[in-house]
Amino acid sequence: MTAKPHKSCQFKRDYPQLINLYPPCALTTAQSLDNFTRLRRSRLTTPSAQLGQELYVMGQWGLGDGLELLSLLHHWQTQTQSNTRLLVKVFEPNPINDYELKLLWDQSQSLISTPHLQPIANAILKAKPARIIGCQRLIFDDGRITVDLHFGDLHTSLTNLPHSPAHPIQQWLVLPHLASQLSGKLAWQMARLSADDAQLIGVNLAETVQQLAHSSGFSTLNVSQDALNGDASDALPSQIITDEILLHERKLLRQQADTAQAFTPKPATLAAIDHPVAIVGGGLASANLMLSLAERGQSSTLFCKDNELGQGASGNRQGAIYPLLTPENDELSRFFQQAFLFSRRRIEALSQASMMDTNAAPHVTVISHDFCGVLQTGHDERSQQRLDKIIQSQDWPAEIAYAVDANEANEIAQIGIDKAGFFYPLGGWVCPFEYAKAAVDKASQLANVQCHFNTEITEIECDAQAWYLHSQGQRFGPFRQLVLANGAQLTQFSASERLQISPFRGQVSHVPAQFKLSQLATVLCANGYLTPSHQGLHCLGASYVKAAEHFDFCPQEQRENLGKMQESYPNQAWVDDIDISGNSARVGVRMVTRDHFPMMGCAPDVAEILARYELHQLNQQQAEQSKHYWQTTPAPILDGLYILGGLGSRGLSSGPLAAECLAAQLTGEPLPLDWSTLNKLNPNRMWLRKLLKGKAL
């Protein structure tokens, strides 16, 4: 079943407020908007064709009503070659969601005069951007078009963003309504992220904006409305800047930023189309990495120990997907909001592709899923206090989560709950192994990918700056880049055995849909979780056992799963309908980190870290010098080896974005995450966290 329409989300801004924050496009006719877009495109310098594709990176200062962005995306869809890709990074201080965007467009009637923009506008609305702080990555047309929405304080967004030397921002569009917020410091941060010949463009740019741009090394293109309505010959650069001193200042600024983040290393060698990336593992993380690489034209080779994908932790029939929130809305909470929304978009896109391709390509996997929402309730006094603290500590966007009373909880669930809770309207459940298979199916359509099944990698070795893999007498390689994404076996190799990550056994019970239980219309999350039925069964779980002695079916854990629901919802008749007597269940192993962040990035050279620690931590007097050393020196890594794991029990939410970010790192493209989050994901963080503070290991 699907949940009945829940109460309307409490959106707080009406049209007059929105139009004040996101004013209409300065280009008043469809023709002038189109002319301006073509002019912007003509001023772009052709980038190098890495991986057989050209990636154009553009920045936008402000969102406005979005017409400039829509026009650019439409032009790219219809007027450019298929081997050209576009990444637009939009910096907007005031977050906006899909509901408000639609309200803005409907009330202003801005799309009536530009009906050709309606399809891409609908695509953005379907992607469901949310009013959250941070970057939201939207991917369209199988990766040909990517939009990064950076919501929040402009200075924080810019200064915390890594520079991408291989693919810097080539052009900036400055919207008039935010021009007054451009300062010298912000202009220099824009310059840090940009190509040395990047241009700053705008309509009727103020003189102060042009001066700020010139003083930080930008050339400018100031376009008049008259030029766009007629002959565009007046749209010439007002000044071309080639000041070597300014360009040197940019270089120093980049070096300073890189030095400040040296403890989070970046790949030394970028991917190449004739060198496939090797991926060990066959779960959701591996599959999404393969897809993210394929969208960039990058080939990959996957090694899976099982006879098909999704037989490890990704093998459950149903898994809940919703964000992890904290009272502080800290880096962990913000990352999971970004990641959850990205994963949701992935599922939607792959599902849409499977519906379109079913007749032509019957092998395409259909993803069983239902975004029926997730209802979280407390199960005892302590958990209720924790949940209340989360609810009350932040003004959460209604599309992320909102509080409901007992009656509303009953209406959402369609069964008796009789307690207040926190509802995640965009959450739900998805079949993880079908998700993984669909991702690989799509990857195989976009790039040269290979999958080796029944191939358990037992050893990896590095020889002459290349990696080789061993399996049952076979040797695979050489590979310039090797990613370990093999879940419970992540620490089986000597190169990864010291990673600070722990395996936890989890048993998920399968119970038949019957009587009142079968009416459940949303995912319940309390002490354990319970999904709506799929193919006649509900999923109930899950146990959480560290250092388990075996991975067979456990009758005690089956009873404990039932007991969790009995504790969470006492005296509810539907709980009596949960029948575990069939002893149907599935056991998996989740790899968990202490801080609940996944691990993503360069594999740390732990032996070298410890050796340098001994060298620099000899006595208290040298402790401060040691602290400075680790803060400014690139952390030791195993060149060419990467980690993607530690997804814990929320891999459905976190895995796809972690994979997307790693794919961007491997190919040298701009990232959808900031430095603060990358530091939290860094596989070396457990050691570096102490070393950066001058503490003993």
Curated annotation (Swiss-Prot):
One of its GO terms (biological process) is tRNA wobble uridine modification. Gene3D superfamilies: D-Amino Acid Oxidase, subunit A, domain 2, FAD/NAD(P)-binding domain, Vaccinia Virus protein VP39. Residues 280-697 are annotated as: FAD-dependent cmnm(5)s(2)U34 oxidoreductase. It catalyses: 5-aminomethyl-2-thiouridine(34) in tRNA + S-adenosyl-L-methionine = 5-methylaminomethyl-2-thiouridine(34) in tRNA + S-adenosyl-L-homocysteine + H(+). In the N-terminal section; belongs to the methyltransferase superfamily. tRNA (mnm(5)s(2)U34)-methyltransferase family. This is tRNA 5-methylaminomethyl-2-thiouridine biosynthesis bifunctional protein MnmC. NCBIfam families: MnmC_Cterm. It comes from the Bacteria. GO terms for cellular component: cytoplasm. Its cofactor is FAD. Keywords: Cytoplasm, FAD, Flavoprotein, Methyltransferase, Multifunctional enzyme, Oxidoreductase, S-adenosyl-L-methionine, Transferase, tRNA processing. It comes from Shewanella sp. (strain ANA-3). The gene is mnmC. Its EC number is 2.1.1.61, 1.5.-.-. Pfam families: DAO.
